[in-house]
Amino acid sequence: MPNQMRVLDFGDGSVPIQLDYPDSKIFSKCSSYGDRVPGTHWNEITVHHKGRLEYSPNPEQIILDALYQAIDGADFFPVFYQRGKNMDTMLVRNCKAAIDKLFKQRLSINLKGGASIPISIQLGVAQYQRHQITPTFHIARVVTRLMKQLIQRDGVDGLLNLDNFGSHPEFKNLVVSLGNPSILMNVCQVIHNDDNERFRLNGFILSNNRIRDIRPLTLLANVDYALLDLRGNKIKSAERLCRALEQFRARELLLENNPIVKISNFPANIKSLESNFELVDGKPFNMLHKIFSPLDVEIDLEVDGARIDTNNMWKLPEFENSQHWHAFMIPDPSHEFNQEVFFDFFFIRLDPTLSNFYPCYYKYINTEHVFLVRNCFDQIAHLVNNCNLEMTIPTGDRIFRYYLRMNVSTVKQHHVDPEECIQKAVSQCYVAQNRMLNLERFHSRECLKDVMVSLSSPKILTYVLSVASRKFMTTCSEIRLCHNKVLVLDGAHVLGMMGCLRAVDLSHNWVQDLSSIHSLGNLPLKSLVLHGNKLCRNYRLPSEYVRAVKEVFPQLTTLDGVDLQTNPGQSLQKNFLCDTGAYELVGAFLENYLREFENDEFRHNLYKYYSENSIFTLTCNYNVVQNHQTPKILQRLSKYNRHARNLRNKDYSKASDGVFFGCTYIVEILLQLPRVTHDFHSLQTDVMHYNGKGAVIYVAGLLRDEPPSTRNGHGSKTDIGGVLLGFSRQFVVTFDEANLGLGKRARRLKIANERLHITNPSKTAIRNAFSVNFPDPSERQAEEDSLDVKDHKLLLFQEVTGLISTWVTSIVEEADWDFERALKLFIQKNADHEIPDLAFA
């Protein structure tokens, strides 16, 4: 509200600003402020947009970008920005150079599209007083705090996190954007002048700040950093970027989602930075390549094509015979869904009996999911006429309404052809040495990056299998289809041409019942893997599950890795999971943990699973039957009862005594517990919560408390043998680090809370105790590696150690091709100085 006398109290402890407008002169459409002097007092800038930006996604940002462009790096720190229907206002001070540049442009700013908006300036609207709000002070305070709170990301620590810097709550009364060169310079000066913290810095996260010019970073140059993250900014000029980073060095530079990466001569236009950065967006310079998408350079979604929405659905038949590209535009303002989850929901509405639907060139643009399709008019008509252009989210019964742009582009020679991509991908999936077609996570293949191939569609799955059948009809003996969200496989007849096919792996899919894969029963399969599908939960007992599968596949000899001829009626232990993504967690964590708990030599290694904030409790309600062995059983149970937190049997004032905190204390308690052996066949697992960041795991089953041994003159003597106990363990685990390991796909978990309970086993559990032999993994004889696997091990070992090929082969062969043993052998030899310098490449 310009010219209205008032007092601005920001409530942050600063002295209020009293707007009294002593000078009534308002400058507009002029190039000079005459005999007035801006001085150090507060000035008011008014932007007269007259509502022209009302329907723009972020009018304030559009105006600020135009102002930053006009002042061209001069000091400019707006305060108290106010949006209005016809005009926006802000206060500034100590910015004479910026005001001069605005007058030089006759108090007009140019928007990105070429339009101009007039502004007016009133000088000295309020007198500056000491301790009033000072933008530079607030900025320095936030930067200083962040420098003391450096973060770790992707295994790199010491990173200063300035992502979306202007969103910090301390700036609620300021306009802070690193897209303003003067503010970026101010931030760099604060960092440069902080000698106490500056030398701890290992990199900078400057993403999502609308930065165009990074010249201020020259202040921080001539130091070797690990990371410079500039993603999601407005960097467009390669020449300006290279000049600004001429002396800046870091292991990796991140430029994703900047205009510069969409320029036709990228990355050649930044080649001068090759000696400054090892990686750009995760790739070495020599592996960078232009990822083409017509959505980037050929299609303007605002003007190209004809819009179809719920208001003009009747126009759709006009495009029935069109061979052009059509764009789907699905609004998602908060980017709630990533690409994979979005398509999971979108595909629900497709009609499986109609044309194959291949979304191409998917991108999230502004606030919308966008992709292109062609040659599937019947599916489009179904989505328009039957689904009313609505995408339903089953959880919460939410609806996302969308629209189409038909005929946005003609088909050009260099555009993607989905079926050609599928044929190429299938060819690359065949492993000749093992005669196996590995279609696991088929949609993630590199040659399918521009097309979404969903094997949850029965027709698309049938097409993929028909391609495979024609290509490998006499050679393929096994097909892996795991992790593909397969719902139905009703076209397995196309595999009839594969005369050698004997094994199919359908694990970790979405198959609901055996009728969905009934067509596989016509093939002479000997091995089938189904675990990880919802159909496995349809059976209470393993024997029921095996019997049902054998009715459809009578010739099977192996089911889920279990030999049905040796162990008829038995299958792997059951898992009850709230999310099928937890299968990997259960397999990797639970078995390893219990194996290490069993082994006296390795139990101390459980230290790695706990942190200083971990909590452990133990309870025991084993009821002892009175007989001649009672004293000895009570003696054995005393090791559990000593640490048990049985509140019903103890004084409530000592309730906290049975709660153990911290990894050291917890492992000390675990080491005092007896040696045990778990009956892995008895285990029942329930993952009650899993979200990728943590999980709640409950496991129950049978264990054998092994007897302690005593020595006498006649050899070894034991007391009463092993005691069978029922047990349950509940783990609350969190993932504290991700993207670990050589493949950057490993995660490190920590147990936040654990409860161990000891009780009486059921009569059924005792009767079936240890009836199935689960050998220790360390005792299993490894199968001979194929030549292809050995070659991969040699290459990986060379990459890890840096040895020349002759030494690599020597050490790996000495370790009998066991990669873990080979690494330990290398470390030992290197420590003993047995490897000469000439052995390293």
Swiss-Prot record:
Chief localisation class: cytoplasm
Domain (RRM): residue spans on this chain: 325-408
Pfam families: LRR_NXF1-5 (PF24048), NXF_NTF2 (PF22602), TAP_C (PF03943)
InterPro entries per record: Leu-rich_rpt, LRR_dom_sf, NTF2-like_dom_sf, NTF2_dom, Nuclear_transport_factor_2_euk, NXF_fam, TAP_C_dom, UBA-like_sf
Top-level division of the source organism's lineage: Eukaryota
Effect in UniProt of substituting R755G: Retains localization to the nucleus and interaction with Panx. Reduces transposon expression after loss of gene
Location of the region described as RNA-binding unit probably involved in Piwi-dependent recruitment and single-stranded RNA-PPNP complex formation in the Swiss-Prot/TrEMBL record: 1-285
Keyword Nucleus: yes
Function text: May be involved in the export of mRNA from the nucleus to the cytoplasm. In the ovaries, forms a complex with nxf2, piwi and Nxt1 which acts as effectors of cotranscriptional transposon silencing. On recruitment to a target transcript, interacts with single stranded RNA, thereby anchoring the complex via the nascent target transcript to chromatin and allowing Panx to recruit silencing effectors to establishing repressive heterochromatin at transposon loci. Does not affect piRNA biogenesis. The interaction with Panx stabilizes the nuclear protein complex.
Protein name (record): Nuclear RNA export factor 2
UniProt organism field: Drosophila melanogaster (Fruit fly)
Name of the encoding gene: nxf2
